[in-house]
């Protein structure tokens, strides 16, 4: 049995390229497992609770439920256009899920894994997550999305995440569940640095699931991530031992790299707490840019999946996303690269091979293609293609989607090269009809086997090949043609071009929008006067062990005062390059403890896009000079 899930997508905005990528990978896997004969369930859906949804609904003069219904419908509509064959469309507002999450919360509470306390810290509304000071970028920005965090203080229930630290590390070691493999070390380092207990309720908004009645505390809403993760189980009707309950645990959770921590640390701990088995694999993919730039409305470079599909078709888009980038790496969307893939691979290698087979078989044997003679004349080519096909299966099972497609097109190349090498038209002229017909049969069998394995990614095109050669894409033929490596006879039928050549770019260019500037709240001059900014000289600067972001400065403000200040600029500056330079520092902030080190002040910097520069006097001035 195979159970595949995408994340349930947050409905604060319409579907984007990242959503499409995850879902197309999941759909390819689900189709592949069905083709292999596995009983399969594929879940996708929408995450509809939380502060972001509440605020987005208010902006649109809508209730949260009305807003969630609208965006959830947009996701379903897009997945239909992409040929997505999900079995379960899950929503966190479903009554069955709400009752299940309350039962799970109560079970954790009764086990002693939940306790009540007070939390104060940096909270990112966009990511619905708390962060420690040491995790922040530039002292106040979210490390995941880059948006400014808020200091939030509220009563909260906490989950004893720290209790499961060793068990999570043991799971990584014994089961090796993280794909791609290089992501595992990042998680191990994070967990080994120490897991803090997790705040799992909120009181600052209303849109969410209330605590179980047994706990008798109506103020609290269950944390959106605790709510959302358990939908993978609740949607199988697990609590009622429904028909789909047997599919747990999941074979693979597919996620973007930004939410790997939630799935690979929080989720296994939650499952351990309620005594449920853990998923077999968690696969984390990268992000997408457009032509080397981060996508944003202000740049006018947002790739809208529906527009790409309308212009080039869902199959070309599905193929491009999976073929273009290794799973786990960041990808770059380029319309020119999409066109190149269509013309060079889908049209030339794939579609043109079908045209050649139909043309030759019609001309040489009235469309009848017999496997007789293939092993006699072309056994080497057949074995070469078989190696590529077997590798393709292996790569897809390990989520290496680009390598899977690469190997399939190498198999097609074996057939195309065989035609060029042996020239069936020349064989016919030499009266070598048996060898010529065997060559056509070799190519037809390679194309049929390849199309069978391409069908999870290109379902419509593969079906056209099956109709043109008169065979069936089925689990029975997977066993016969791939596992048993049998050859088939075919009857060729006329077929339209699978992928016509694309002569010019078809996407409309977006008009660049002027970025909307958010007005900061006005302050009085008296308030500003309270801030003391001084010039200081960097006497020493060092990296902090265990942190990729923090630098530790020893600053001289005047002859008598030396201060230690921490700043999250290690990604932008080398520590040794800053020694001897002057910087500007807010000198009258309360002392803070960051990553176990005292920090007495804040070094000023300016950030523009991906660049950050320190604020410094234009000319050398006396240390301790006031700015302002």
From Swiss-Prot:
- The residues listed in the UniProt record as binding ATP, with positions renumbered to this chain, are 297
List the catalytic activities from the record: tRNA(Met) + L-methionine + ATP = L-methionyl-tRNA(Met) + AMP + diphosphate
> What EC number(s) would the UniProt record show?
6.1.1.10
Q: What is written in the cofactor note of this entry?
A: Binds 1 zinc ion per subunit.
Read off the PROSITE patterns from this record: TRBD
Quote one Gene Ontology molecular function term.
Answer: methionine-tRNA ligase activity
What cellular-component terms does GO give this entry?
cytoplasm
* tRNA-binding domain ranges (all copies): 527-628
For the biological process aspect of GO, one term held by this record is: methionyl-tRNA aminoacylation
Motif 'KMSKS' region: positions: 294-298
The cross-references to Pfam families, in alphabetical order and at most eight, read:
tRNA-synt_1e (PF01406), tRNA-synt_1g (PF09334), tRNA_bind (PF01588)
User: Which cofactors does the annotated protein need, by name?
Assistant: Zn(2+)
User: In which compartments does the protein localize?
Assistant: Cytoplasm
Entry superkingdom: Bacteria
Q: List the disulfide bonds.
A: none
Residue span of motif 'HIGH' region? 9-19
Q: Which UniProt keywords apply?
A: Aminoacyl-tRNA synthetase, ATP-binding, Cytoplasm, Ligase, Metal-binding, Nucleotide-binding, Protein biosynthesis, RNA-binding, tRNA-binding, Zinc
Positions contributing to Zn(2+) binding: 124, 127, 142, 145
> Which CDD domains does the entry mention?
MetRS_core, tRNA_bind_EcMetRS_like
Assembly: Homodimer.
To which protein family does this belong? Belongs to the class-I aminoacyl-tRNA synthetase family. MetG type 2A subfamily.
What does the UniProt function comment say about this protein? Answer: Is required not only for elongation of protein synthesis but also for the initiation of all mRNA translation through initiator tRNA(fMet) aminoacylation.
Spell out the protein name for this chain: Methionine--tRNA ligase
What organism is this sequence from?
Answer: Campylobacter jejuni subsp. jejuni serotype O:2 (strain ATCC 700819 / NCTC 11168)
